[in-house]
Amino acid sequence: MSDEINETCKPQACAIQNCLMKNGYNESKCSYYIDELYKCCKKFYESNGSSASSVCCPKFNLLQLKLKQRELGQIDANLIDTKHG
């Protein structure tokens, strides 16, 4: 077993971070990039099995849940305005 860190899907994960920074961490504006990461991670698990691991991908069971939620059109997150004024 290798001690090497698996960074499969790193470009997609970095794209999410860049999008979040550009959009004030409003996750709903970065759905495209989140979907791209999930697609990449799905391919990763299909090729390597459900016990595989990448620091850029959610665990297999969580990815399955997220993919199912997105198929149903559920939104991952909304920015809640907590400013009072």
Curated annotation (Swiss-Prot):
Domain CHCH: 6-48
Entry's transmembrane regions: none
Cystine residue pairs: C9-C40, C19-C30
Keyword hit for Mitochondrion: yes
Principal cellular location given in the protein's record: mitochondrion
PROSITE patterns: CHCH
Keyword Amino-acid biosynthesis attributed: no
Cellular localization per UniProt: Mitochondrion intermembrane space
Top-level division of the source organism's lineage: Eukaryota
Motif (Cx9C motif 1): 9-19
Chain location of the short sequence motif Cx9C motif 2 per the record: 30-40
InterPro entries on file: CMC4 (IPR027179), Cys_alpha_HP_mot_SF (IPR009069)
Gene Ontology CC annotation, any one: mitochondrial intermembrane space
Alphabetized UniProt keyword annotations: Disulfide bond, Mitochondrion, Repeat
Family: Belongs to the CMC4 family.
Comment text on domains: The twin Cx9C motifs are involved in the recognition by the mitochondrial disulfide relay system.
Protein name stated in the entry: Cx9C motif-containing protein 4, mitochondrial
Native source organism of the sequence: Candida tropicalis (strain ATCC MYA-3404 / T1) (Yeast)
Primary gene name: CMC4
